[in-house]
Amino acid sequence: MTARDGSNVLHPVIEAASRGIFPEFTQAGFERREHMTRVGELLRSWARARKAGALEEARWAAAGYLHDTLRDADPDELRPLVDSRFLNYPGKVLHGPAAAQLLRRAGVVDRGLLHAIEFHTLGSPGFSRVGLALFAADFLEPGRKLREKWRAR
């Protein structure tokens, strides 16, 4: 099994995230980190259920651990980090594109994983499996405090 960038190893930041180690740039409080952990472990379990292999399990878990790393950051601090196509987006959705950009700057080249993190709040027709899974897991993780009317019965 290979990583989506074609290599047999994960980038060190991705590998660390898959073990629950957040990057230095993370701006997320305790409850947010708990949410990220639940999403990461839910994604790991889904990848395992798919028999995707250890590398894919780690990738999927990392997506969950990384998706909200900048969720508690001030949107005005995130705007300079994001691609110009996101500049008119609401502040609450900038954390995904900003986190993906900081991961790129750190040397992460896994396009599917970066796209998943970048668009996890809005969704994207270009999602790979990890993107689709992250989009669902972020909403469905068991600790999420969403109003009952949004949940299927």
Describe every region a protein language model picked out:
Residues 14-17, 38, 52, 59:
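Alpha-helical protein-protein interaction elements
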Residues 22-27, 34, 44, 49-153:
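Divalent metal-dependent catalytic cores for phosphoryl transfer on phosphate-bearing substrates
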Residues 9-29:
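Generic N-terminal amphipathic, Lys/Arg-enriched alpha-helix
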Residues 5-9, 49:
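Catalytic cores of the polymerase beta-like nucleotidyltransferase superfamily
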